[in-house]
Structures are given as C-alpha cells and as structure tokens.
Amino acid sequence: MNGKVKWFNNEKGFGFIEMEGSEDVFVHFSAIQSDGYKALEEGQEVSFDITEGNRGPQAANVAKL
C-alpha cells in the first residue's frame, strides 16, 4: 500500500500515515526499513504493509518512496 506521512514524532518514535479513503495507520520507528536513524518527514510518500497490532492496524515494512 502507499500513503503519506500525516505526522511523525522523532522524539517518541511514532506517528501516523494517511491513505485516501481509509483511516490513518499507526507507524512505529521499528517498522521503517532504512539504515541509520529511522525517522519520517511530514508529507513524505511511503509504501507499507498493514498488520494487526495490539491497538488496531499498524504499518509494517515501511519504505520511503
């Protein structure tokens, strides 16, 4: 799936991804597929999978586009 980062708090290490016609999806820094510091920028395009977490759907295998 593809979406845009709605917001991401670098200090806390989480945020949300928005998709057209769907609810926002929680994203944790541990789901970001990159080397080094794992963070996302507001408005950044990403691809991801959705898994079922403890508190509902969350992003997995997040890659910056």
Swiss-Prot record:
Signal peptide: none annotated. It is found in: Cytoplasm. Keywords: Activator, Cytoplasm, DNA-binding, Transcription, Transcription regulation. Disulfide bonds: none annotated. One of its GO terms (cellular component) is cytoplasm. The keyword DNA-binding applies. It comes from the Bacteria. Pfam families: CSD. Residues 3-62 form the CSD domain. One of its GO terms (molecular function) is DNA binding. InterPro entries: Cold_shock_CspA (IPR012156), Cold_shock_domain (IPR050181), CSD (IPR011129), CSD_CS (IPR019844), CSP_DNA-bd (IPR002059), NA-bd_OB-fold (IPR012340). PANTHER family: COLD SHOCK DOMAIN CONTAINING PROTEINS (PTHR11544). Homodimer. This is Cold shock-like protein CspB.
